[in-house]
Regions:
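Enriched for short, Lys/Arg-rich terminal
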Residues: 29, 67, 71-96
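Basic, Lys/Arg-enriched alpha-helical interface segments
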Residues: 2-56, 73-76, 95-96
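Alpha-helix N-cap/helix-start and coil->helix boundary motif
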Residues: 10, 36, 66, 85-86
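Short His-centered aromatic/hydrophobic patch
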Residues: 63
Length: 96
């Protein structure tokens, strides 16, 4: 399986990285490492995470208040949001 981030999700990841780097040097890279680990968990076990709605799933990010919101299309994982879990729930639904 491969994984693809939609443009808005990639921008959210970049924004989160920059915010954490501004807080403490190196913290943004720790976020990226946790996202990388989550992406590998998703690719290994794509259906292991809780379902949101009918077809989407959410994989929580360790140590950070984020979740990867994703769908499965044939052999590709589509990440539609790198969602901050304490802000605007379900803001990403128009991307579906």
């Amino acid at each position: 399986m491969k994984i693809r981030f939609l443009s808005p999700a990639a921008q959210e990841l970049e924004d989160a990285f920059q915010w954490y780097e501004d807080q403490m040097s190196g913290l943004g890279y720790e976020l990226i490492a946790e996202i990388y680990e989550a992406a590998h968990r998703i690719m290994a076990w794509p259906e292991a995470h809780p379902i949101l709605g009918h077809t989407l799933r959410r994989c929580l990010i360790r140590r950070f208040p984020y979740g990867l919101i994703y769908g499965i299309e044939e052999q590709t994982i589509i990440v539609i949001a790198v969602a901050h879990l304490h802000r605007k729930p379900f803001y990403w639904t128009p991307r579906i």
